[in-house]
Amino acid sequence: MKKYTLLSLLAITLVLFSCSKKDIAQPLEETQNEDLSGYLEIASINLGGLGAAEITAFDPSTNRLFAVNNGAENKIDVIDISNPSSISVIKSISMLPYGGYVNSVAVSNGKLAAAIESTNKQAPGKVVVFNTSNYEVLKTITVGALPDMVTFSPDGNYILTANEGE
């Protein structure tokens, strides 16, 4: 009994002395919501129905926007936005040769990375890397099951995927 009393006393002492006033959370910095009334729509484009234009990536070197379009077809739409008041789809890159649906795109240093799931969602997926100017395939990389997101490292030397692996 004395053993448990001593252990309890030590535990209580430890808890009391491990807390300090500086551990108390400070109030968060107040944030201001942006006034959205200053934003105006300058253009819009219809890429299809459900599943169209879910994920996009912009390439500043070509002024092109790459949009995942899993609506009626499995493709990436290439949108010229060099003139923002008159945007248009200039190309569609079919994802059919690469497996299942494209889930994500990212752009860095003239390269477009597309995360593509396998037709069997538990099998390894792919990241296909395209040139953003001529859409040629630069590399195909096998990744984990169901790659749901793709991004480049800040220096553009590495590609990272988040795989759902259902």
Predicted ranges, named:
Residues 1-7:
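Bacterial N-terminal signal peptides that target proteins for export
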Residues 4, 16-38:
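Bacterial Sec-dependent N-terminal signal peptides
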Residues 8-16:
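Bacterial N-terminal signal peptides
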Residues 30-166:
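Mobile, glycine-rich extracellular loop/lid and propeptide segments
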